[in-house]
Amino acid sequence: MTERFDCHHCNESLFGKKYILREESPYCVVCFETLFANTCEECGKPIGCDCKDLSYKDRHWHEACFHCSQCRNSLVDKPFAAKEDQLLCTDCYSNEYSSKCQECKKTIMPGTRKMEYKGSSWHETCFICHRCQQPIGTKSFIPKDNQNFCVPCYEKQHAMQCVQCKKPITTGGVTYREQPWHKECFVCTACRKQLSGQRFTARDDFAYCLNCFCDLYAKKCAGCTNPISGLGGTKYISFEERQWHNDCFNCKKCSLSLVGRGFLTERDDILCPDCGKDI
């Protein structure tokens, strides 16, 4: 007796008929398509065994149904893009959704490298320095007056030049007497200490820190011989081309402060009236 060879689902004999094996079990074509065939996204019909099943992200189409949602041209073996569950050819997608290059005004095609800045887009080859016309790419750039500059060109064309070293000032500049300086170039003429953020003074157009200015130019106190800066509200006494700090203007003998008092002189000494009576 001949062994039976039936459809695993409907039990109809498969002798002399077309069948499909699934997990080693045979099915007639009707049962296989009913049970296992994918449904076409476009027409809603099963994709039969005799049809090519085209799939994209767990969705399936008949070959004849796999076309652009707008122009209806076939997408078989062609690049395409998906937008909100719709498949579009590259031309339709670009016309509808792709951004336009800020420079050449042409569409930036899907898959093309582009540069974006403040809501605008450029082809990579169109995003160039306004001065040297070279592509900026991923390098640093500086925008000015709706134009983009690579850093070297910006420094040459727009950055202020330090009055000391004559090089561009890109960050952290100092203005003194309406002239720009690098912070590291604006230093004391004597000790070369940076003056940015420090108190300083000038003589003959040269800047000095307070210590150097006092050492070089300040008058010396006749009492302690230290400089009298005259800066910051420092008070001092001047008499016959000699100067004293207020705290140093005292009687030579009794050390009484003579500020605001009468006094006498004995050679280079100053004396209070009481000590001067014995002269």
Curated annotation (Swiss-Prot):
The free-text tissue note of the record is: Expressed in skeletal muscle and heart.
Ribonucleoprotein found in the keyword field:
no
Kindly report the protein's main subcellular placement as a broad class.
cytoplasm
Give the top-rank taxon of the lineage listed in the UniProt record for this protein.
Eukaryota
Any S-S bridges, and between which cysteines? none
Q: What cellular-component terms does GO give this entry? A: focal adhesion; nucleoplasm; nucleus; Z disc
Localization annotation: Cytoplasm; Nucleus; Cytoplasm, Myofibril, Sarcomere, Z line
Residues covered by the LIM zinc-binding domain:
40-92, 101-153, 162-212, 221-275
| Annotated Pfam families | LIM, LIM_FHL2-3_N
Q: Where is this cross-link: Glycyl lysine isopeptide (Lys-Gly) (interchain with G-Cter in SUMO2)?
A: 78, 167, 220
Q: Which is an annotated GO molecular function term of this record?
A: bHLH transcription factor binding
The Phosphoserine modification is found at 238
UniProt zinc finger (C4-type) residues: 7-31
Subunit text? Interacts with ZNF638 and TTN/titin. Interacts with E4F1. Interacts with GRB7. Interacts with SIRT1 and FOXO1. Interacts with CEFIP. Interacts with calcineurin. Interacts with FOXK1.
Q: What does this protein do?
A: May function as a molecular transmitter linking various signaling pathways to transcriptional regulation. Negatively regulates the transcriptional repressor E4F1 and may function in cell growth. Inhibits the transcriptional activity of FOXO1 and its apoptotic function by enhancing the interaction of FOXO1 with SIRT1 and FOXO1 deacetylation. Negatively regulates the calcineurin/NFAT signaling pathway in cardiomyocytes.
Recorded domain comment? The third LIM zinc-binding mediates interaction with E4F1.
Q: What is this protein called?
A: Four and a half LIM domains protein 2
Q: Which organism is it from?
A: Homo sapiens
Give the classification, highest ranks: Eukaryota, Metazoa, Chordata, Craniata, Vertebrata
This chain is encoded by the gene named FHL2
